[in-house]
């Protein structure tokens, strides 16, 4: 059973539920096309990571966004 985990730091209120559905469909279709997996067995989980809980270069993404 393929297990795909997508981690996103939401920006400007997104992604929307429709965009998440499109991601789930698109990633599943890609697994079928590239790896010949059974679509019914593909698990996709989308984790939305708060910008305070993710860092880059020693600074939280939240802090980096405030600087810009």
Swiss-Prot record:
Documented EC number(s): 5.3.2.-
Keywords for the protein's UniProt record, in alphabetical order: Isomerase
Pfam families, alphabetized: Tautomerase (PF01361)
The UniProt record lists the keyword Calcium: no
Origin: domain of life: Bacteria
Molecular-function annotations in GO: isomerase activity
SUPFAM superfamilies: Tautomerase/MIF (SSF55331)
Active site annotation, chain numbering: 2 (proton acceptor)
Family: Belongs to the 4-oxalocrotonate tautomerase family.
Protein name, UniProt field: Probable tautomerase HP_0924
Source species of the chain: Helicobacter pylori (strain ATCC 700392 / 26695)
């Amino acid at each position: 059973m393929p297990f795909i985990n997508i981690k996103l730091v939401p920006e400007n209120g997104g992604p929307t539920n429709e965009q998440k559905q499109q991601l789930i469909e698109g990633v599943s279709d890609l697994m079928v096309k590239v790896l010949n997996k059974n679509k019914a067995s593909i698990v996709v989980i989308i984790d939305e990571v708060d910008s305070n809980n993710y860092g880059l270069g020693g600074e939280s993404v939240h802090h980096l966004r405030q600087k810009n």
